[in-house]
Amino acid sequence: MRQLAIRSKLILILILALLPIGLSALVSATLSEDAASNHGFINTLLDGLLIAGILPIVTMVLATSSFGNELEDRTLSYLVLKPVPRWLIVLPKLMASIVVGSIALIVSGAVATLLGGSSIGAVLVVLDGSLQATLAVGVAVFVGVVTYAAIFTWAGLVTSRAIAFALIYVFLWEGLISSFLGGVRYLSVRGYSLAILHGLDDTSFEPLRERVIEFPAAVVGAAVTTAVFFWLTVRRLRQMDVP
C-alpha cells in the first residue's frame, strides 16, 4: 500500500512537471513570436501555471509527508530519542524534498523557457538572451521549492491535515490575496520567486516589472522564511508528545 502511494506521488509529480513543457511546445508551435505572446507566456505559463500552481503543489506533496512514515508507523519516538540534535533529524527530511522537487521543477521550467516565449524563444537562439532567462527561471524555482519545503515540512508535523492546510494556504494566500493586495507579496513565496526571476533578468521578464517586489527584499524574505520555518519544525519535533 505504501509503495503504491509512493508510486502515485511520483507519477503525479512527473505529470505536473511535464505539463509546462507540453504547453510551452504547443504554444511555440502554434503562436507567432511577438510581444503579446511573450507576455502571455510569462504571465500565464511561467507565473500562473508553474510558479503559482505546479511548484507549490509538487513541493506540498513531497514535504508534507516528510515524516509521514514515522508518524504512520508510530516510530517517530525512535528518532527523537536518538542522542542527536533535532535539526540533524529535520535537515535530511527537508533536503530530500528539496532535491526531488528541485530536479523535477527546474528541468520543467528550464525546458519550458527554452521552448516558449519570443526573445526567451527557441533553442536555436539560446545564446541570444534565453540562456540568462533559463538560469533565472531555475534559480527562482529553486528558491520557491526551498521556501515551500520548509513551510510544508513544518505543517506535516503540526497537523494531520497538512495537505488541506497547504492547499488553502497556496490558493488563498499565495494565489488570491497576494494578487489583489500588493503588500502581501512581501510575505509571499510566489512573490519572492517572481521578484528573483525578474531581478536576475529584467529584460526578458519585463512584463513582471509592475507587480514584483524589490530583488533584495525577495532574497531576504525567502531566506528568513526558510530559516524561521526550519526552526519551527525543529522546535515542534522537540516538543511533540510522541507515542
How should each PLM-predicted stretch be described?
Residues M1-L14:
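Aromatic- and glycine-rich beta-strand/loop motifs that create alpha-glucan
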Residues I11-L16, T159-S178:
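Pore- or pathway-lining transmembrane helices of multi-pass membrane proteins that form conduits
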Residues G22-S66, V90-T159, S178, I196-D201, ...:
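Secretory targeting signals
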Residues T75-L79:
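Short cytoplasmic-facing helical segments at TM-TM junctions of multi-pass membrane proteins
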Residues V80-P85:
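Short helix-to-coil transition segments within interhelical loops
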Residues W87-V90, L237:
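Alpha-helix N-cap/helix-start motif at helix boundaries, enriched for small hydrophobics
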Residues E174-L200:
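Juxtamembrane non-transmembrane "cap" segments at the membrane-aqueous interface
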Residues T203-P243:
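Alpha-helical transmembrane segments of multi-pass membrane transporters/translocases
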